[in-house]
Amino acid sequence: MFKPNALFLTDGYKIGHKAMLAPGTTKLYGTWIPRSVKYAPKNIIKIVSFGQQMTWRWLHDEFEENFFKQPREVATQFGNDMSAYLGLQYDASHFEALHNLGYLPLKVKSLPEGIETAPNIPHMTFINTVDGFAWLTLYLETIVSSLAWKPSTSATLALQYRRRADLWVKNTDPSSMWLVPFMCHDFSARGLNPHDMISSGLGHATSFRGSDSIITIPAARYYYGETDVCINSVNASEHSVSTTKIFTVGEQQMLSDWMKTFPTGILSVVSDTFDLWQLITQYLPALKDEIMARDGKLVIRPDSGDPVDIICGIDDYIQNDDGTLYSVRYTSGMFRDRNKKITVSEQKGVIELLWDIFGGTTNEQGYKVLDPHIGAIYGDSITIDRQVEIYERLAAKGFAATNIVLGVGSYTYQYNTRDTFGFAAKGAWF
């Protein structure tokens, strides 16, 4: 297994910085700061402080295993490699001195994790505690930066989803606020590298319990001392297993079989392997008695198309005298022409169709809530803006926000950089 000397976890230009320090420099004070929301999603003005404990625990472990526990020759060999790298003789005595010391002589301070700050407020500081190691403080800038920006960024984005879910559930189904921690489910693992699976998964878990990033469970235990399982999920199908059943017993029988395999609890079924609308309008009515008799909820999961229209239906349409429906295309806010022919199912959308079949209740706020034996989740192309649009469109049709669970994927948690919130580790005092 590739386990390089931990000294390699830096930028090449750091190698010469010890010799560039002013003579007599004994201490160097570093800061970790989100400096800007210029490139952040709109309306985000604060950043969540998160990930510092994980960052320094990981860094400690890395240096312990791949530097301090190794023979002293690893420091000498690193110096030889740097001589070849720079094309001149390199003095590695300070790395040898660090190895002799046996630990990273740093004092780290951090804001409490989970609080929000405006930009330009340091989330953590670090300073060398032993004279002669001022060079070490920002030698670690590279690895601290690469470790720390992702968990804070993901926690900040997760909080935006949480606040919007809180608001819409409070307005449309306040007696079900307990559902909010499960209304945005982490689907992002497959779009992230293994370390980001951990850091981003933990970031999501600061606001939600719903997650398929199961690496979050041991990571929370190790880095944060979480004794309980901090996330939850359900039995759920994917297209591959659906296809094996559809081609052998048919889709309707597939649903019936799976409800027998999983007779209790929530069962999520990917529903557009072939035809979403056929599954909803033909197979679900045929299986209604089984679904309603089951001790749990069957969750329908569309997996393609415009999530807003699939969930909520198409609200911009016209109907010909013969009953044919067409979606409407607009240009610059003005009606232009018919766009394409649509079905009644497409016009209604998943939630209304499920209501037509299974019904439910109307709560005190006047919003419809699906029968607890049926539900829906959508986990493709979800963004913060689409989350709000889905809640708005459902409310306009008289449905509570609690009728839908959203899968938040790698677009949300991967489509970011260190510059999203302007994170930087910099020296501030010597």
Question: What does each of the following model-derived ranges do?
Answer:
Residues 299-301, 375, 403-407:
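Beta-strand segments within the central parallel beta-sheet cores of soluble alpha/beta enzyme folds
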Residues 29-90:
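Low-complexity, highly charged intrinsically disordered N-terminal segments
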Residues 360-361, 367-376, 403:
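Short beta-strand/loop segments at the ligand-binding rim of alpha/beta enzyme cores
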Residues 314-318, 393, 419-426:
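Short, surface-exposed amphipathic charged segments that create phosphate/polyanion-binding patches used
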Residues 111, 376-384, 408-412:
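Glycine-rich beta-to-alpha transition loops that act as phosphate-gripper elements at the mouths
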Residues 397-424:
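Glycine-rich phosphate-binding active-site loops on the catalytic face of alpha/beta enzymes
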Residues 1-40, 90, 96-105, 114-364, ...:
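Buried, small/hydrophobic-residue-enriched core segments of structured protein domains
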